[in-house]
Regions:
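Polyanion-binding surfaces on beta-sheet-dominated domains and ring/shell assemblies
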Residues: 2-142
C-alpha cells in the first residue's frame, strides 16, 4: 500500500523497515512518513485542502484533508491495522484526514482505494500557492 500511496501522491518514497510485530512496524512507518511529509512542506504556502474520490470495482472512497496543524483522523477503513496507519500518519503529518466509504464490500478494494484517494488528495493539497490559504494572517508558525 505504501507503493500505491507513493504512486498516487507523486511522492518518492523509499524505505526499509523491520519491527517486532505488524502493529509496531505499520505504526512506525506511518509516523516516519507523516513526520517526513510535514518537514518537507517547510512552511511554504500550499493549497492545503483537497478532496479526491476513487472508484475501484465495488469500492467508492473519498478522502478529504487539510494541512492545518490540528491533527485529526476519521476513517471508514474495515481493517484496524490500516485505520491505525491512517491515524498515525495524520497525527504525525499534522493534517485533518477524513476517509469516507460510500460503497464497497471487498476489504482489499476498500483499503487500496483509500490509499489511492489519500495519495491523490495529498498531491493536490501540496500544490504551491502564492499566499497562505487562510482568513488568519498565518495558519502555522514555523
Amino acid at each position: 500500500m505504501i507503493e500505491t500511496l507513493a504512486r498516487y501522491s507523486n511522492m518518492d518514497i523509499t524505505m526499509t523497515a523491520t519491527g517486532d510485530n505488524d502493529h509496531h512496524l505499520i505504526e512506525d512507518v506511518a509516523i516516519t512518513l507523516g513526520k517526513t511529509f510535514a518537514k518537507a512542506l517547510d512552511g511554504s504556502p500550499i493549497e492545503r485542502m483537497a478532496t479526491a474520490t476513487v472508484v475501484m470495482d465495488d469500492a467508492l472512497i473519498m478522502t478529504s484533508l487539510d494541512r492545518v496543524d490540528r491533527p485529526y483522523c476519521e476513517t471508514d477503513c474495515p481493517d484496524p491495522i490500516y485505520t491505525h496507519f491512517f491515524r498515525s500518519f495524520a497525527m504525525s503529518a499534522a493534517i485533518s484526514l477524513h476517509i469516507v466509504q460510500f460503497r464497497g464490500f471487498d476489504d482489499h478494494h476498500i483499503i487500496e482505494a483509500s490509499f489511492k484517494s489519500m495519495g491523490m488528495a495529498l498531491k493536490s493539497a501540496v500544490r504551491p500557492r502564492e499566499t497562505e490559504l487562510s482568513t488568519k494572517d498565518k495558519v502555522m508558525e514555523a
